[in-house]
């Protein structure tokens, strides 16, 4: 065996620094490496077919049935249906089988149609033509036939067919522009960079002769992360190793823009592409309503088992006497007498289970799903939540949490881009204590933008002038801003000046503002060409700097750096970042003066950044290059190694100055927060900004008020006192004024709570969350939570993304288990959005990662007010009524059946006809509650927006508490007693018909069923406050349908029925005067307690919502009276 092959296998399967199991090797163009390299081992990867469908023609039926019967309710009814088939039961298998068949069939048709559409889309994608290089020539084939290692050519406006490593383009600088709108919703153009050693290959022959291998990580779904390296082989020399990152990766689904063509090598194909891996849905979130519904279901299941058990025991007690067990007309056979008693009892128990199984509402699950699915469209159709400026409307990524929007107790919000506009404007810069402002009014005149002015000392020293220019050069060079000459380019952009057509583009609005601001002060960034950055200085001379390295920004370091080389050969490292990140790394500069200015600007709500630098000698730079290269080419723990390298490089800096950028508060952000607080919701701001800046924003948006007493839990205070002492001191402060915490205080819904505000920073939070050797961490957390519960607002500053999620999780799993909502607009907010019960993304300027990973997305923060106070309120009211109503009407349905067993010797005789058993939940009572759960508005939309306190009436799952559930259950039992015994007393009078005949068993059951259908439907009509023609049509139409169906079902001889026990029954019942009287009287008696309860509660213990309803009705009557009087006076005047 070849030694190189053995060496490769040993490296691959033995442990070492690089874990080869977690990486793959790809041979570019399927070409074997030159002699001396590692042996060529062909590897098997999936083809490029995308399969987003779940089913095939062969497995649809078994797989779909398996998935549907995994649901507990469907499986339960399947068992009931099988019991009906196996043993002799009182009801036909049709009564359970038909509703189950209907539910399963409707769901299967819906899922099958959706899967058919996915098949069509997959086929269209898999069969689209793709150009690839084979033996130096351009060949065309279908996308599905692409393999890993193929070299592909993509033209402008074409979509990348798989995940590609960018090798070259027609551009001389080896760049290309892409849009990823179909992946993450971002329409801005992103720049990607070709591999340095392949960007000169512009023809098919050149690229076809490339000898290279790529080593990269195994497929993973993160769109913004990629780790790999490329080995480019030459004929004589050792391979050149270059790192590969996300900037070199072109993702499937992205589109090539403003570039004629590119060449790339396929590394991930088919279902291993990042787009395909992102098909997987997020973890399922369950709402409080769903949890309550499952708890109620368990209660009713226990009631069902109890009923069956009681009836089984009573049956055998009743039949203990021989003449009852074997009446003369129903003698048992010998085999029946010899059957095992326990087997007979178990069979009877199952028969009673079948008889009473309708107490579990199978159709409730279908109705709830339809209500959530259809209800989500009301959010997306809401014109009030459409933002004309961005052209965006609300998005619903999941409809399972609509009602959870009405239960929120804590809101965790990001600051930048969520509360603020993320539209940055450069305000000033401070250089060694000298302040420069672009727009200044001097002697009544506005100075030219390019001049600027030193607000403290207009004539700094010669050395100061050098530092000033170095500071401006640092701002011109330390960024990732691009300059485009095409005005049609999308994305955040700024024109350098009004007379030029070029635009600045960056994923960070801060960088655009800084580059634009320094341009007004005399230094203009021109472009990046052939790895040289060009700037125009104050003397209108172009300066060129070679870009050697970029140390990219990340939210943990909170800074970025560049290493550049000037035309004179001097090498500089320029670094900019947060003051907390820069100051500890500074050894020289006027730190105290700049720190004072930074703190002053922060208090005014401005965003601040500090700028520092250091000169590097050639030997230092070469050492940095080796350090960075080793970290960049690592396949395992690359991010960790890069972070360690950055720590070693970004130190011993000289402080140059600081900048101040204004980020204005969003429109109506303050009004929204004020309304949310009135609704009893606690609002926390979680931000990475410094404390002073964030606090100023909190005051501006009315989170903190002038009379709010601020409590600080920051690193600075903890340095002066121990963490234990600080926590106990704050705890005593808040408890001294607020007293013992009540249950409402804990939930954040007390209006009388002392107005405290807490400020905590990331370092202090780390100390609180950090486990201690003595196990005291838990005590610290409890103390911290106790303090937070007593504060009306909390500000968490200097937060890393994972710390935001930690805060949300801490509150989410506290002992009160409040419902949490997280809202943000950037990638650093995704972790807390996924952690919260409800995650909302703001469709902002920092991309769409937050919107993609959220449950809902809105254009602006102000739309959160209507999302919660209106939509959330309505959906909670609607679905709560739906759940309670379903259980109520099924108690009404099945309890008379239970009572009937005491009058038929526990013989399992059914009270209702098979057709009524089957259609009760499917047809007779289903549509009214569905329309109610979609249309009901117990108060007007304007009232809910105007009076946020109404939100408190439905907080903490108020309408699905056990007290309310028991009331609905008892109401159902009372109505069932009225139905049964009212009809029973009517039947005691034998003169119920004109000819003296008495009613039979089926007429008795039909009378009970008729009263029941009318009662439960009219009960819903009484609960309806918002009437439309659709409600009228469905409610009265359902009653009419029942009457017409009963007339046809009993008035026609149906040939497919073996026996027709309902023939002429309904018509005979309607021919009886007492039956008509009984229906009217029993319906009235059944509805009376609920009506009296509502009237008394409204008068004696009205809720805020009921007071508003009463006031609205009075105003409506008053306005109608005034209108009638005005009309009368008008007619009399003539």
Swiss-Prot record:
Transmembrane segments: 62-82, 89-110, 297-318, 350-372, 882-902, 915-934, 965-986, 1001-1023, 1030-1050, 1069-1093
GO molecular function terms attached to this record: ATP binding; ATP hydrolysis activity; ATPase-coupled intramembrane lipid transporter activity; magnesium ion binding; phosphatidylethanolamine flippase activity; phosphatidylserine flippase activity; phosphatidylserine floppase activity
Site description Cleavage, residues in chain: 457-458, 490-491
GO BP field: phospholipid translocation; positive regulation of myotube differentiation; regulation of membrane lipid distribution
Expression tissues: Widely expressed. Expressed in myoblasts.
Record keyword Ligase present: no
Family: Belongs to the cation transport ATPase (P-type) (TC 3.A.3) family. Type IV subfamily.
Disease: Deafness, autosomal dominant, 84: A form of non-syndromic, sensorineural hearing loss. Sensorineural hearing loss results from damage to the neural receptors of the inner ear, the nerve pathways to the brain, or the area of the brain that receives sound information. DFNA84 is characterized by slowly progressive, postlingual hearing loss. Leukodystrophy, hypomyelinating, 24: An autosomal dominant disorder characterized by global developmental delay apparent in infancy, impaired intellectual development, and loss of developmental milestones and ambulation. Brain imaging shows non-progressive severe cerebral atrophy, ventriculomegaly, hypomyelinating leukodystrophy, and thinning of the corpus callosum.
Entry protein name: Phospholipid-transporting ATPase IH
Protein species of origin: Homo sapiens (Human)
Gene name in the database record: ATP11A
